[in-house]
Amino acid sequence: MASTLKLPVGIENFEEIRKLGFYYIDKTRLIEQLLQGWGKVTLFTRPRRFGKTLNMSMLRSFFEKGTDKALFEGLYISGNKELCDEHMGKYPVIFLSFKGVDGLDFTTARRMLCAILKDELDRHYYLKNSDVLTDEDRTLFTKMLHGQDDNIEDSIRMLSKLLYKHYGQKVVILIDEYDVPLDKAFQNGYYKEMVSIIRGLFGQALKTNEFLQFAVLTGCLRVSKESIFTGLNNFEINSIVDIDHDEQFGFTDDEVMKLLLDYDRSERYPDAKEWYDGYHFGNADIYCPWDVINFAKKLVSDQSARPSAFWINSSGNDMVKRFVDKADQTTRDEIEKLVAGGFVEKQLRLDLTYDEIDNTIDNLWSVLFTTGYLTKIGEVKVPDSESYAYKLVIPNKEVREVFILQIQEWFKAVVANDDDTMKLLSKAILDKDEKQITRQLNIVMSRMISILDTKAPDAMKENFYHGLLLGLLRGSNPDWLIKSNRESGDGFSDILIEPEDPDAGIVIEVKYAKEMKELDAACEAAMAQIKNKRYDEALRDEGRCDILAYGIAFCRKRCRVAGEKL
């Protein structure tokens, strides 16, 4: 019988999921791992939409005083009774999410940060009337509550001090999406000012805070320690290359199969794997949870639903765009290899500052890896060095789609800015100059990044070149009427062109050749098909009698052109 539990699309509150009857994949082992592998301050870096916020909400529900212990009944952590007795509901908790800190200028972003801090102060409003606190403490809290204390950098530490005094227990600090303010600041030109505030906040709250039991932070990027974590001792960073906690963010293969079985959709497991699997965190093979939950929800209402790019569409993909735009010829060749299903070997930096990201193409490789657009399938030792390089691949079909989209957008811009080549191409087509057509097409293709999957069937490869040529023709002369796959004669012609001259018409048939030596034969086959299928008939029906026919064959980044007047 299929599960009747609701699927929690977009719900990141652990208590809400548990109380309102949503499906939950148990990640409570993270609690045990954190407490057994003790660290004063732990930073988890994972790509966006990989369950960071839900896990932080789960930690808050477990540790915070007054928690509802029934939330954890039947979950992994409940089996460790000794740990639960010692730690569940034992700590005051400060929980902050910096996800909403945005702004086109520093003043706006600072105001948003203050609002988030105030929301957490409001959550602890009871401190205003605490009998344990002194009058001075309560006055300070009231000032902080009403935004009268401008010392924002000390606000988290001061709140933890007041909580410690009230409860007589050190505080757990949870900071989700710690790096979002830095990302937005870098994009909008106030990075140094934001770094100063975040460094001050963390320095006071995490470094010199005698009232801290432990802290957990999450984010996408591991910002260099020297940037905002200066001087922090006992500071542990857990990233996508680490084995510890490698199954606690994202879904494992077994978890995805069980979810699909629970909803009677196990036959769609291959689709889920092809589109959303492929991430390698530590030693674990991981699926993107945002994708899996969204796909499963679609399947519940429509068993034949096709996979969609849920993760990619949940925010912009500027990093891939910047990468493609910045790529030199060597990098473009490497991108082609990735899109074709291959791997590249790269030494990466996992601790960048945001203002270093665009400094080199190597830094962009690193960011694509840490943000989930690339994943590792192994490591290789760098010759004459003690260092290792990662073997990087595009993780799955969904991410491959975003690379293809950005490559197509980049190529359109390249073509649009090359008026000379486009004019020469259109003139050569009208003049039946096969050599010049070949030359101009080869020039354009030498600049492009191929998005061909080497494992794709020949028909798909032919469609790729068809689409490429169609785009070039539309860019070469905006006054031409160009039709694709239109019925003509005894079939469907690849491309028909109606130039400004009312008597002129052009027929083009596209072929794919596996090897360079097959280009001439492919051109001849294209020309024979045009004649045998009478693809010129639709143009003649329009009164166009001066017809040129072209057979154009492609192999990798080269082409051959045969032409004839019909």
Predicted regions and their residues:
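Walker A/P-loop-proximal flanking segment of P-loop NTPase domains
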Residues: 1-64, 68-80
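Conserved P-loop NTPase mechanochemical-coupling segment
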Residues: 9-18, 101-104, 108-153, 181-186
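P-loop NTPase motor core
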Residues: 10, 61-126
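Substrate-engagement module of ASCE P-loop NTPases
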Residues: 121, 155-166, 193-213, 535-538
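Sensor-1/coupling segment of RecA-like P-loop NTPase cores
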Residues: 180, 190-232
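Amphipathic alpha-helical segments of the small helical/lid subdomains adjacent to P-loop NTPase cores
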Residues: 225-232, 238-297
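Extended alpha-helical interface modules used as scaffolds for assembling large macromolecular complexes
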Residues: 235, 287-534, 559-566
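Domain-level recognition of nuclease-like catalytic cores that cleave nucleotide substrates
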Residues: 538, 542-566
